[in-house]
Amino acid sequence: MKEGSVMTEILAIDDDRGILEVIRRALSREGYHVTTLDDPQKLDESQLPRYQLILLDVMMPGMDGFQLCRKIRDRVDCPILFLTAKTDEKDLMEGLGIGGDDYITKPFGIGELRARVSAHIRRENRERKHNAV
């Protein structure tokens, strides 16, 4: 969150609570405020506009990350990054085709997670600054 004084809000959704805790700790140390959900059904869609970035696990029981992305993409303009163990080109193309902005392959390193999140946040901040001029 080195780009400004307003705390950047990130939403992470994954059915694995251990991964959510790793994400929360890693990104909180960078100054981000991270909200975690272990079930996409618990998402309060009225809160979506507050997030500047969303991390979505692809493979979750009930509603998977692709289904959730399709459901919310037209209501959010922030980056959506998929977390997945799926590495097929078909899955990658599907995720990007439905509105995902990037993929982070599991298992992922903390450095990669922080770098990708930071890069997307920086780009969003540049676009907002440019559009405000």
Report residues per predicted region.
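C-terminal output helix
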Residues: 108-121
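Active-site residues of response regulator receiver
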Residues: 14, 57, 84
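Acidic catalytic/metal-coordinating carboxylates
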Residues: 38-39, 64-67
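Conserved acidic segment of CheY-like receiver
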Residues: 7-18, 23-27, 54
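Acidic, metal-coordinating helix/loop segments flanking the phosphotransfer/catalytic sites
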Residues: 36-53
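The feature encodes the CheY-like receiver
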Residues: 20, 61, 88, 106
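Short, Lys/Arg-enriched segments at the junction into DNA-binding effector domains
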Residues: 9, 119-133
